[in-house]
Design a protein with these regions (language model features):
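Juxtamembrane helix-loop-helix connectors linking adjacent transmembrane helices
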Residues: 1-21, 151
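Hydrophobic alpha-helical transmembrane segments
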Residues: 11, 15, 45-50, 65-66, ...
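Hydrophobic residues within alpha-helical transmembrane segments
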Residues: 20, 50-54, 70, 90, ...
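Membrane-interface helix/loop boundary segments of multi-pass membrane proteins
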Residues: 24-50, 77-84
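Alpha-helical transmembrane segments of multipass membrane proteins
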Residues: 52-57, 73-77
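Membrane-interface helix caps and helix-loop-helix hairpins in membrane proteins
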Residues: 57-63
């Protein structure tokens, strides 16, 4: 049970749930795993998918597997296209901060089994798909000029 009853609780959770995992997980998944898999494979897209799959599995949420896989793909492409861990760290941290702040705004209490429920609302899946497509488009729009300069 995550319980946030004050702004102080929110700020502590933003650091513990938002910022620290956003940095640490990106160092591990993109900075080590994706980088090492990319060295061994010719196709970087396969390395990004494998890393996103591992990222999603790492979170141990059956119902959240697909949304976490999609954010893992966004983070993987953000790293691949920008060539820097800073962009995926920022995206990951902002995602976590958004979720933490949303929980606080909803009353600050949520039980873990609510998150892991097998009954995922179709609206949540559609929202995840739209968010994934939007973030992918934005990342490609931002990084495409940089890629063309590097060629």
């Amino acid at each position: 049970l995550l319980n946030m009853t004050s702004v102080q609780d929110l700020l502590i959770n933003i650091v513990i749930i938002g910022i620290i995992p956003g940095i640490g997980e990106e160092l591990l998944f993109r900075g080590v795993i994706q980088k090492e898999i990319s060295k061994k494979l010719i196709n970087p897209h396969v390395a990004i998918f494998i890393t996103a799959f591992l990222f999603s599995a790492f979170h141990f949420q059956v119902a959240g597997f697909i949304p976490k896989l999609m954010i893992g793909l966004v983070l993987g492409y953000a790293y691949f296209l920008s060539g820097s861990l800073i962009l995926p760290m920022i995206i990951h941290s902002l995602n976590n901060i958004f979720l933490t702040t949303s929980l606080f705004a909803a009353g600050g209490k949520i039980q873990t089994q609510d998150i892991q429920s097998e009954n995922v609302p179709i609206a949540a899946v559609l929202f995840s798909l739209i968010l994934f497509a939007t973030l992918t488009y934005l990342i490609l729009s931002i990084t495409k000029p940089n890629l063309q300069q590097n060629e």
